[in-house]
Curated annotation (Swiss-Prot):
Keyword Disulfide bond found: no
Pfam families according to UniProt: Tenui_NCP (PF04876)
Gene Ontology, cellular component aspect: host cell cytoplasm
Official protein name in the record: Major non-capsid protein
Family: Belongs to the tenuiviruses NCP family.
InterPro entries the UniProt entry points to: Major_non-capsid_tenuivirus
UniProt keyword list: Host cytoplasm
Domain of life: Viruses
Amino acid sequence: MQRSADVSIGPITGLNYTDLYDSLPSSVSDNITLLDLKEPERVTEATKKLILKGCVETAYHHPLETDPLFASVHKHLPDFCHSFLEHLLGGEQDENSLIDIGEFFKLLQPSLGDWITKYYLKHPNKMSGIQIKTLLNQIINMAKAESSDTETYEKVWKKMPSYFSIVLTPLLHKVV
């Protein structure tokens, strides 16, 4: 894989967007531009989901924390995903309260009910790397901009960008 010029650009301070672009799976980078990473408001819902899934895959296959790529890309993935998911969900979020784990647990039952527990949702660091990756991909699959006047939106989706970042962080420190 050829590296692009070393330039840090975009709204997430310290994130090298060119390195991020180069780190994404080709199934993602072949279908987006560098500008798509820097300006989430310009891309479709499907492209946002594609980028988020690419970031989860990039986090899952992270280098050692001593690798320069970890410092320029991977450690910034939680903030980047927070921003992208916020755009996907409509831009409004609530940083001051926690996600309703019980409500979120119910939402996950059709897809992850065979293994997900409330304990795992409260303590994502206790999950294996593949479990975290599966949960994050399911959040992306379920995410969409919806009316802000629903109870589910208030209890779960309004708070999801922060929760997503919290769940993604332990993935960056797991050996897979």
